[in-house]
Amino acid sequence: MLKINAKLGGTNFGFDVLLRDSYIKPRTMIMGADVTHPGAGSTNVPSFAAVTASYDEDFFRYHMNWRVQPPREEIIADLKEMTKEHLLYYYNHSEKEKPNQKRPQYIVFYRDGVSDTQFAEVKRKELAAIQEACKEVAKQYKWEEDFKPIITFLVVQKRNHARFFPVCPNNKTPAGVDPKQGNVKSGFVVDTIITHPWQIDFFLVSQNAGKGTACPARYRLLFDGGIKINELEIKRMTFYLCFLYARCNQSVSYPAPTYYAHLAAARVKLYCNNKFDDIDTSAGRDKEEIYRDWKAATDRVNDETVKNMKTFIDNNPMYYV
């Protein structure tokens, strides 16, 4: 029922107003991004990028868009256009009355699936794409010239080898810890010793692991918009976003917008199943030419989806959950 309600435009839960106003500034758009890749050995299937963005004050509803990518390409190639679509969707669905209050003043971007060696490239290319999107939307739709949302860019790393256990002096189980599991409590944070010495870098165990050992997610701040951002606010905002995943009434292992981006990328991969079988991907063909053929095929898939489901998608933008 939780999933169905979210698909049909309902709200399962949201931020407590006091918590929301304490840790998230007004007119904030929270985005999540992920790229799904083909299986090992697949040469005739591209990667798919999906980006989600909140458009309500409860940070429960997220608009989604997607693009095809060259195989194994982690940098989101068309992030600028995708961000422009999200900015316009946020503006058109804002509950504010004044036009200047319908534009996001802050953007928090959670980027999934990036390794340490890709940090510099992702920051250089994807951050620039978001900034260019804001600039072009402001110019095209005659928003104020100084429309420059403050961007907070965070990387989410789900796959890591860190595991944490509560200290048990004299073999006594600490209060609140299940003796059968031995996991730390939900909300446990490690931000010293094994993290970066001066950048905002922390591990967060946000979920209650029912079985086995809880796996933490690691978060690294790559850009803070030129302002001295409060580290505690980032940690709490990240933790609370883990409670807003529509399918579950408990906290999950990483923030809902990133989770949704992962679901969306997997869904569009199914949309395009068997759509690339007739495309020549032999070694002799130019890679750009192959990519254009892939893009044309996915454009047809997108057109068919919109044609068949336009009214449903317009009324239920979270159909992909």
Roles of regions detected by a PLM:
Residues M1-V321:
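Long, contiguous domain-sized segments
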